[in-house]
UniProtKB/Swiss-Prot annotation:
Location(s), subcellular: Plastid, Chloroplast
GO CC annotations, alphabetized: chloroplast; mitochondrial small ribosomal subunit
Gene that this polypeptide is encoded by: rps2
Name of protein: Small ribosomal subunit protein uS2c
Disulfide partners: none
Length: 236
């Protein structure tokens, strides 16, 4: 895998608050190598390590995108939800940003059935099929469609398991991470100072609570994916 330059600037990361970890009482001792200091009761993340692992992650996603691989971005907490959907749409990735339904990957056959149902209902709605039904039946189907749109809208075009999963908050998305580990799907995960750095294939130490921090990391990864996709299209 070729190493590339991704213009990851330490001062820009500081302005985004990427270096602010959790309070010193809420930490995972395994994060010690990624912490540079304690300040006013919080741990400070070593941004040199952040830059190194973010660069590795960018190399990985660029390489995968240049070979036509598929990505899934997972971030369901309120702060991250809009950032995740916008980033995923920009890079033509699948995403989950509302709620992770247990077994979404490990029980893929069930997820596929839900997706087929979702597509059928969307087609029915577009062709005004609901208007031909009794009002009560139409209302039930509309509620079903709304629920499926909320939870599966970001993966509606997914036809198989993703090749790489990007996780925005390890603690929040632990179930998704465990499913990826079970299936052997490579993962990239933001890890704050209360996380376990040994679970994901590439762990990026960063503040996973601040919107600016999440945006900074996502923007770099999305840029790398888009660059990789351009390379894939040109070489196809």
């Amino acid at each position: 895998m070729t190493k590339r330059y991704w213009n990851i600037d330490l001062e820009e990361m500081m302005r985004a608050g990427v270096h602010f970890g959790h309070g010193t009482r809420k930490w995972n001792p395994r994060m010690a190598p990624y912490i540079s200091a304690k300040r006013k009761g919080i741990h400070i993340i070593n941004l040199t390590r952040t830059a190194r692992f973010l660069s590795e992650a960018c190399d990985l996603v660029f390489d995968a995108a240049s070979r036509g691989k598929q990505f899934l971005i997972v971030g369901t907490k309120n702060k991250a939800a809009d950032l995740v959907s916008r980033a995923a749409i920009r890079a033509r990735c699948h995403y989950v940003n509302k709620k992770w339904l247990g077994g979404m990957l490990t029980n893929w056959s069930t997820t596929e059935k839900r997706l087929h149902k979702f597509r059928d209902l969307r087609t029915e709605q577009k062709t005004e099929g609901f208007n031909r039904l009794p009002k009560r039946d139409a209302a039930v189907l509309k509620r079903q469609l709304s629920r499926l749109e909320t939870y599966l809208g970001g993966i509606k075009y997914m036809t198989g398991l993703p090749d790489i999963v990007i996780i925005i908050d390890q603690q929040e998305e632990y179930t998704a991470l465990r499913e990826c580990i079970t299936l052997g799907i490579p993962t990239i995960s933001l890890i704050d100072t209360n996380c376990n750095p040994d679970l994901a294939d590439i762990s990026i130490p960063a503040n996973d609570d601040a919107i600016a921090s999440i945006r900074f990391i996502l923007n770099k990864l999305v840029f790398a994916i888009c660059e990789g996709r351009s390379s894939y299209i040109q070489n196809y």
